Amino acid sequence: RRLKRIGAARDHDIDLAAQVPHGAVRLHVMGERGAAREAATADDIAQMAEIVAAGVAAGALGFSTSRTMNHRTSRGEPTPTLTASEDELVGIARALGRLGRGVLQVVFDHTDRDDEFDMFRRMVSESGRPLSFSLVQNPFEPESFRSVLARIDRARADGLAITAQVSARAIGLLLGLPCTLNPFMNNPVFAEIADRPVADQARAMTDEGFKARVLEAAAGDKVRKLGGGLIHRFDAMFELCDPPDYEPDASESIAARAGREGRDALEFVYDLLAADDGTTLLYLPALNFAGGNLDAVEVMLRHQHTVPGLGDGGAHVGTICDGSFPTTLLAHWGRDRQHGRIDLPFLVQRQCRDTARTVGLFDRGVLAPGFRADLNVIDFDQLRARRPEVRYDLPAGGRRLVQRADGCQHTFVAGREVMRNGEPTGALPGRLIRGPQFSTRRIT
């Protein structure tokens, strides 16, 4: 019924699909026990498996689960699926095996890599269904991703369809007056203006007396402790310009720029945020940027058993704007990077054909008779992402970060043009995809 409502609710410019989310199913079956992350009983597992199989039979592409501390409830608690047992996940996977369709997807923290990967192997071996998971470079164990890639190679050699989803650039945070986070968000003096419109905040910040009060409060122990985490990592924080540089040099960090001017980094960033009516954005790459570069991303992108993924364009809308990952993939890796450039045909194949096949869509991603006429016509020399901007067009005037790109001249979906030079044409041929899709003509 939910899929039917999604498909009928509105028309779409592109196709969309659904997964069966583990968290919702676990709460439905186990109630408060599920929310408290209690172990599932055999009966609980059987009920969850039945629901997941029914969802996939109705048209969901597969089953997804989260095992990361980065995902939290609205109360800040870990999600119900964080510690779900191997028996629970294997039991659900077996149900898809009996059904003979559906993919398995996992997000996890890589803290218990050996046990987790052994569980992934069992999920695939006992179900026969393909599994993919997110893989990033951890700054605290910057070489650990290599051992994960090696495990994938061994699994593939054993006939297990396990794939890593990797990103085209660092995964990080955007900070600024219009965003959820900014370096002064915990400052009691800044709090006096925090509820004002952004332009009004910026004007208030130009008052020298107010600035002195903010910086004086920032020197206090309590504020320094509150801000001592990510929001004050000025050695790893950069101004995000237009067009944005997603592989910035350390010499362009906020700390380095302030140092060259003989200024305190906090005062320097204060003046940046107060400029341009408060529209300045700061970029804090957190994952995939150990060593201050994207060399690890290059290794992951080139690996034979990875696909591009993780382009988060619809969640954390005041902090992250990663829907432009495909643009970065082509422009940065296929054209702009000074070393480690990757062949453009390889990147296009990965982004189009390989990502589609990973989720069971064998009817698209290839320009050939019998396949979906979904394509972009790109002026490759002009292709680039623009700096994100903030819009207030969510319900109740809610805020979201959006990002445009130059260079995409035409976008066709099912043979109909839906975008022309970055603007919608009004055509809405998109549809809800139900289950795996196959071309009328098979090619290798």
Across the structure, where does each feature detected by a protein language model lie?
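Surface-exposed loop and adjacent secondary-structure segments within mature catalytic domains
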Residues: R1, R5-A9, I14-A35
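Active-site neighborhoods of metal-dependent hydrolases
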Residues: Q19, G23-V29, A36-D44, M48-S74, ...
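Divalent metal-coordination and catalytic microenvironments
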Residues: L16, G59, Q165, G262, ...
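Acidic, glycine-enriched loop/beta-strand segments at the rims
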Residues: Y283-G291, V297, D343-F346, A356-V390
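Short, solvent-exposed cationic patches
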Residues: L432-T444
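C-terminal cap of metal-dependent C-N hydrolases
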Residues: D295, V299-T306, G311, N376-R431
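Short, well-structured alpha-helical segments that form the helix of a local strand-helix-strand
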Residues: E267-L273, D343-C352, L367
